[in-house]
Each structure stands twice: as structure tokens, then as C-alpha cells.
């Protein structure tokens, strides 16, 4: 009986593994799970003794490996989930993570995540609008504290100090906050109220003590190398223009966002995604120049391919703005213009930079933000019903979540405001701590790669002086 039970378990395991191999893209993870499961099954055969204990022992062992055909459907699902979880933890050390990280390749050279303590003299100060965002200041502060421990940065946290301390104590962050203040890695800078999400951007001119203005002044006076805000993006743009000014020759700054592509190590920079809803051909030409510098410096692409978002590949396609912009980009010799980019090609990896007006870009951005959740829901609804579907769901759960993460805006953190005299990172209004950490990594990388130095070189180009 002992031998028969062991044979049945082994057969069940093999059937599950064969089914998974036919339906999963990550076959190396499955191989690891299968080896673990078969080994555990053999151990189970030696441990199980006595007819009366066969079923219970088999249930305990199989619950940690790959399946128990003796138990109910719920036990089968739990078993499959445990196998995938075990395999995933093993795979983390042997396979490249599937989560999209636009600056993943830069982490080694930047030393962003280092086990060695970086002295304060070598850390970069970043000003943070602690009051900007739907849920500020708690998730902003939590993200800043997390980023300080992971990256060689210090934070000037701008906000109403009394409120920041009260909220930190309420959520249990006060001890960590005081520790970082004592270590001179975080400084609280007092300010007035933030510019509300529903307020006009021009409010920054009247309220000089607004948190975004105070943060921007820190960059202006060189007390910080970059600024981050998850508040009113229009107010951030207005404050940047009024406080630190535009780059010489740039008519309008643009918001550049990194989108995932088929190659998770090579994202595409799309700009503008919301700063300028109405654009001239000269604006888009300048966006291409800005994006080209960013792709070279931060993304480390030697010869970025620039695309113009349009409804067709042909030169004659599109509206008046597209046709005139195409002509300007085609005549530009300082970058590699790859022609029109249709909507279906944005995430293909064929282009490194895609330019468009802010109205179109913002729609594209918001659409992409919804894709991850919708895709996951569709895949779940298409799985078979019953026992087989539940087992399949358990096997695919971790993979589906990784797909969702690759398309989740929280994983990307923020977008750069390009075209002003400083590094400004704009966060999503609903940013949580994970988004803040990602955005601060983006700010650090931009500073570390001397983006501003090279952007300032653009004014030497004839096109910006004409």
C-alpha cells in the first residue's frame, strides 16, 4: 500500500508538471519545482509507515510539494500554490526578475543599492514636496525613509513640520524619522500649505511659502540637486519656470515618462505626457532634442531612435502638426530620426524616444496605467472552471502578478520635467511609498549621469538659437 501511494503521488506530480509546461512561459521555474516535488515525494515514501498513517502523512508532505490526489480539491490547490511559491523563491536567485525596472541596468554602475555605507559627503541632497499628493505626507515620508536606506541620497523634506511629526508619530515612523534627522540624512524644512490639486497652477505666484515653491528654491540655491513632488503637476511646472527658469532656447518644458517595452531592460521615453496640450511643430522638435539627451545619458543608449507618434508610417499621414513636425525632425542632423511611430509600435521596442503633444501623450499614459489590471482580470476569467482551473490559477498567480507589475505605474514612480534649469521629478497624485522610492531613484540617476550639464549644451545648437 505504501508503494502504491508513492506511485500515485509521483504520477499526479508528473501530470501537473506536464500540464504546466504546456501552459507556462517560465519553463525553468517549473523544472526547479518538479525536481523539488519529486525529491520530496521520494522522502515521503520513506517516511510514511503503517496503513493507518498513510493518508495523513501523505497529505502533510504533499501539501508542501506538488499535489495530493488523495485529498480534496482545496488541498490540491494549496499544494500547487506552495510548489510555485517555492519555485519562485529559488528562481529569484538564478533568473533575471521579470518586474520592469527602467533603470535596472544602471544600478550596478550607480551603486544605488550598496551594502557599504556611503559617507554623507558623497550623498546627493534631493528636495521633496512632502505635502504634495492625495495621501501626503505619510506615504511620501515613508518612501523617503525607504529611499535613504537604499540609495546614496539625503532628503530635504518640505512641509508643515508640526503636521509631519504628528503624522509620523501616528503611523509609527517617528523613531525612524528622528534617527535619520540625527544622522543628518533627512532635514525637515518648514513651509505653508501645498497647492491643491484643484487649484490653478498660477497660484504659485501668489503663495511664495507653498511647499512646492520652498522645495524649488532649494534647487535654485543649489542646496538640493533635484526636486520631487506628487502634487499638482501644473503647479510644479509653473513653479519650475518661475523659480529656476527654462533652458535657453526651450519654448516649453515637457513631461517625459518611461514606458515598458518587450525588452524589459530597454524602456521607451514618451514626451510630452501632459505639460502642453496644444503644441507647435517647434515644441515637438525641442522635445525630441531633450529626449535624445536623456536617452543617451540616463538610459545609456548610444544612438537613440526617435519616433513621432502618428496615425500611419507614411510621411504624408496625420494632421497639420504631424506633417510639419515630420519635416523638422527629418532635417535634424543631431539625432537619429526613425520616422512616424504608430500607436501599436510605442511598446514594441523599435523606438527609444517617442514625441507627441501633451494631450495625446496623457491619454496614452492613462490608458497604459489601466492595462495591467484589465489584462490580469481577462486572464483570470479565461482560466478553466473547476479543479483544473484552480490548479492553473495557483501555478500562474505569481507570473500574472509580475506581468501586472511590469505595467503598473507605481513601479515606475515618476516622470521627468525636461526643459527647465534643474532636475524635477513629477509623481502620480495617488503615489504610495513604492512609487516615491522609484521616483527618488530616477532623480538620483538623472543627477548621477549629469543630465543637466548635457541638456545645457543644447543651447549651442543652431536650432535653439534661431
From Swiss-Prot:
<comment type="pathway">
    <text>Lipid metabolism; phospholipid metabolism.</text>
</comment>
<dbReference type="GO" id="GO:0005737">
    <property type="term" value="C:cytoplasm"/>
</dbReference>
<comment type="function">
    <text>Catalyzes the reversible formation of acyl-phosphate (acyl-PO(4)) from acyl-[acyl-carrier-protein] (acyl-ACP). This enzyme utilizes acyl-ACP as fatty acyl donor, but not acyl-CoA.</text>
</comment>
<comment type="similarity">
    <text>Belongs to the PlsX family.</text>
</comment>
<dbReference type="GO" id="GO:0008654">
    <property type="term" value="P:phospholipid biosynthetic process"/>
</dbReference>
<dbReference type="Pfam" id="PF02504">
    <property type="entry name" value="FA_synthesis"/>
</dbReference>
<feature type="region of interest" description="Phosphate acyltransferase">
    <location>
        <begin position="123"/>
        <end position="466"/>
    </location>
</feature>
<dbReference type="InterPro" id="IPR003664">
    <property type="entry name" value="FA_synthesis"/>
</dbReference>
<keyword id="KW-0594">Phospholipid biosynthesis</keyword>
<keyword id="KW-0444">Lipid biosynthesis</keyword>
<protein>
    <recommendedName>
        <fullName>Phosphate acyltransferase</fullName>
        <ecNumber>2.3.1.274</ecNumber>
    </recommendedName>
</protein>
<dbReference type="InterPro" id="IPR012281">
    <property type="entry name" value="Phospholipid_synth_PlsX-like"/>
</dbReference>
<feature type="region of interest" description="Unknown">
    <location>
        <begin position="1"/>
        <end position="122"/>
    </location>
</feature>
<dbReference type="GO" id="GO:0043811">
    <property type="term" value="F:phosphate:acyl-[acyl carrier protein] acyltransferase activity"/>
</dbReference>
<keyword id="KW-0963">Cytoplasm</keyword>
<keyword id="KW-1208">Phospholipid metabolism</keyword>
<comment type="subunit">
    <text>Homodimer. Probably interacts with PlsY.</text>
</comment>
<dbReference type="GO" id="GO:0006633">
    <property type="term" value="P:fatty acid biosynthetic process"/>
</dbReference>
<keyword id="KW-0443">Lipid metabolism</keyword>
<keyword id="KW-0808">Transferase</keyword>
